[in-house]
């Protein structure tokens, strides 16, 4: 119902305002096949898109896997692969002849030490008897080799180390003697002072002995 004092025409005007709506935008027309058009893209694409276009994602994954599978190889100067260095072979054991020579040197050294001890020291009769028996045992060809080595070790301990130390000491003394005996150049002044003057001898010199005669020597007492 209309209020008193207002015309009845305003009511439909208010209802017309409420029902008034904005016009809708026209929808894009679809093709006959019913497929929707692809969205519009800008003509300028970023650099990453171009790079992605040249290298697909699948190729990059395959390249990474290939890099992981290939081992790192050291190449030589000419581009060829450097062969792996083989471990150095172990030194060959000494021959039987070398072992026999080494044993002969060790036996000679031990016998020499025993003989030197008998000459330079004053052993008791018991010690002298033991040293003579050891020398006889070491020189005997019937004595087995293990028995000789056991005897040498019981007498001298580590005789090989003692032989090595003695050899080094002798080599050091020999080097010192060689160094001290080197010929040194003498200066010209020293050479003139110590030089001898050689004078020619006279052609005719007096005879020191009298002439021998064929006459018989006699005492002239009368």
From Swiss-Prot:
Bias-annotated ranges (Basic residues): 17-28
Positions of post-translational Omega-N-methylarginine modification: 27
Biological classification of the source: Eukaryota, Metazoa, Chordata, Craniata, Vertebrata
Species annotation: Mus musculus (Mouse)
InterPro entries the record matches: DUF4615
PANTHER family the record matches: UPF0488 PROTEIN C8ORF33
Residues that bear Phosphoserine: 75
Low complexity composition bias: residue spans: 1-16, 29-39, 93-103
Keyword Mitochondrion part of the UniProt annotation: no
Family matches, as Pfam families: DUF4615
Protein name stated in the entry: UPF0488 protein C8orf33 homolog
Keywords: Acetylation, Methylation, Phosphoprotein
Region named Disordered: 1-103, 119-146, 186-210
Domain of life, per lineage: Eukaryota
Residues annotated with N-acetylalanine modification: 2
Similarity remark: Belongs to the UPF0488 family.
């Amino acid at each position: 119902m209309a209020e008193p004092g207002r015309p009845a025409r305003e009511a439909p005007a208010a209802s017309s305002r409420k029902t008034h709506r904005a016009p809708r935008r026209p929808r894009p027309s679809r093709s006959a096949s019913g497929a929707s058009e692809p969205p519009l893209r800008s003509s300028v694409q970023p650099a990453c898109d171009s790079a992605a276009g040249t290298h697909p994602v699948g190729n990059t994954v395959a390249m990474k896997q290939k890099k992981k599978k290939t081992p790192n190889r050291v190449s030589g100067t000419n581009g060829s692969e450097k062969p792996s260095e083989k471990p150095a072979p172990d030194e060959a054991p000494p021959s039987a002849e070398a072992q026999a020579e080494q044993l002969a040197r060790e036996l000679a050294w031990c016998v020499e030490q025993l003989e030197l001890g008998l000459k330079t020291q004053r052993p008791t009769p018991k010690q002298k008897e033991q040293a003579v028996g050891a020398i006889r045992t070491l020189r005997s060809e019937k004595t087995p080799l293990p028995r000789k080595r056991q005897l040498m070790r019981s007498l001298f301990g580590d005789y090989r180390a003692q032989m090595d130390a003695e050899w080094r000491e002798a080599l050091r003394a020999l080097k010192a003697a060689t160094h001290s005996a080197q010929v040194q150049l003498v200066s010209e002044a020293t050479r003139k002072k110590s030089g001898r003057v050689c004078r020619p001898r006279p052609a005719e010199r007096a005879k020191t002995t009298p002439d021998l005669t064929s006459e018989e020597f006699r005492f002239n007492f009368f």
